């Protein structure tokens, strides 16, 4: 069996890691053993935070909707319950956007939901 020299593959592997670690501070950017750990940890953080990002944005949308709805003397939970009863299927992202960008349309939506909630009560 012929001897395999691994210089090319080792260099490619090291280069891949050190390229991923560019911009890091200290020895993390150029010492392979330390850079490898830093890149692995960065990947873990990226994986975790791609999931957390969804939670954070949903919380932001809910906070915005709640603030906008409270200006019309209503709470978020009553508003969302009214949305279900009125069979209006707008997601929180769109509602949040509407509350900021198109206040008139949002106000019309709130008045419609108020009428649905008052009719049910």
UniProtKB/Swiss-Prot annotation:
UniProt keyword RNA-binding, yes or no: yes
Protein name: Large ribosomal subunit protein bL20
A biological process from GO: ribosomal large subunit assembly
InterPro entries noted in UniProt: Ribosomal_bL20, RIBOSOMAL_L20_CS, Ribosomal_protein_bL20_C
Lineage, top ranks: Bacteria, Pseudomonadati, Pseudomonadota, Betaproteobacteria, Burkholderiales
Family: Belongs to the bacterial ribosomal protein bL20 family.
Gene Ontology MF term list: rRNA binding; structural constituent of ribosome
Key words of the record: Ribonucleoprotein, Ribosomal protein, RNA-binding, rRNA-binding
Pfam families per UniProt: Ribosomal_L20
Domain of life, per lineage: Bacteria
Record function comment: Binds directly to 23S ribosomal RNA and is necessary for the in vitro assembly process of the 50S ribosomal subunit. It is not involved in the protein synthesizing functions of that subunit.
Gene3D superfamilies listed in its UniProt record: 6.10.160.10, Ribosomal protein L20
Protein species of origin: Polynucleobacter asymbioticus (strain DSM 18221 / CIP 109841 / QLW-P1DMWA-1)
Any one GO cellular component localisation term in the record: ribonucleoprotein complex
């Amino acid at each position: 069996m012929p001897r395999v020299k691994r210089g090319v593959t080792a260099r490619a592997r090291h280069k891949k890691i050190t390229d991923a670690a560019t911009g890091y501070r200290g020895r993390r950017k150029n010492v392979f053993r330390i850079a490898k750990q830093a890149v692995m940890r960065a990947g873990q953080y990226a994986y975790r935070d791609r999931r957390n990002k969804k939670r954070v944005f949903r919380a932001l949308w809910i906070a915005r909707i709640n603030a906008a709805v409270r200006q019309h003397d209503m709470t978020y939970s009553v508003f969302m319950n009214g949305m279900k009863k009125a069979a209006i299927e707008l997601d929180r992202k769109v509602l949040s956007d509407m509350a900021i960008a198109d206040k008139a349309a949002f106000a019309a939506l709130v008045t419609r939901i108020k009428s649905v909630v008052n009719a049910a009560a």
